[in-house]
Design a protein with these regions (language model features):
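Conserved N-terminal beta1-alpha1 strand-loop-helix module at the mouth
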Residues: 1-52, 58-62, 144
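Glycine-rich, proline-tolerant flexible connector loops at the mouths of alpha/beta enzymes
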Residues: 14-36, 67-82, 130-141
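Hydrophobic faces of well-ordered beta-strands that scaffold small-molecule active sites
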Residues: 16-18, 43-47, 65-67, 104-106, ...
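Short beta-strand/loop segments at the ligand-binding rim of alpha/beta enzyme cores
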Residues: 37-45, 93-106, 155-165
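Catalytic cores of alpha/beta
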Residues: 51-60, 111-121, 165
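Hydrophobic, well-structured mid-protein blocks that either form specific transmembrane helices
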Residues: 67-124
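Histidine/lysine/aspartate-rich catalytic loop segments that bind and position anionic ligands
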Residues: 103-155, 159
Length: 166
């Protein structure tokens, strides 16, 4: 993983994102440590909001953590976090990260209630899930989903959140 990260940096990447899954199918804990120490740019650690992952992030102290939901069977992250139903728990994680100087981001579906909840818990940024948009075929459905993404991005920016999409 470090060789790939360094190659990406050499090609102009301004940051490296790695997703440490609970089942460790892509990378291992030590890979995260090696990449964090070996890169020259910023490390964004994508992870599930579990105590095990929080502990590792607090040890490593990446530039940013991005919390994502995780199901063992999925190939890639399929949906956004339900921030509305987890505000208290996510707020505690946010506080721990920000106390260590780690930026805190949430991967959410394009939904205004989720944007508002992300702002209430004082996230630094959100990443809007564009997965559904990429899978739609009907022009009408595509337009509707794009509108949801745009409205969510606008609301987040108005609330002072940095916005990413992916």
């Amino acid at each position: 993983p470090l060789k790939a990260a360094l190659l990406a940096e050499k090609a102009g990447a301004q940051g490296i994102t790695i997703h440490l899954r609970e089942d460790r199918r892509h990378i291992q804990d030590d890979d995260v440590r090696v990449v964090q120490k070996g890169i020259n740019t910023k490390l964004n650690l994508e992870m599930a909001p579990t105590q095990e992952m929080v502990d590792l992030a607090l040890e490593i102290q990446p530039y940013q953590v991005s919390l994502v939901p995780e199901k063992r069977q999925e190939i890639t992250t399929e949906r956004g976090l339900d921030v509305c139903s987890q505000e208290k728990a996510l707020s505690k994680i946010r506080e721990k990260m920000q106390d260590k100087g780690v930026l805190f981001s949430l991967f959410i579906d394009p939904d205004l209630a989720q944007v508002d909840a992300s702002q209430r818990i004082q996230a630094d940024s959100i990443e809007i899930n564009t997965g559904k948009y990429t899978e739609l075929k009907s022009p009408k459905e595509i337009e509707r989903e794009l509108e949801r993404i745009q409205k969510s991005a606008k609301r987040a920016a108005e609330k002072g959140l940095k916005v990413f999409a992916g």
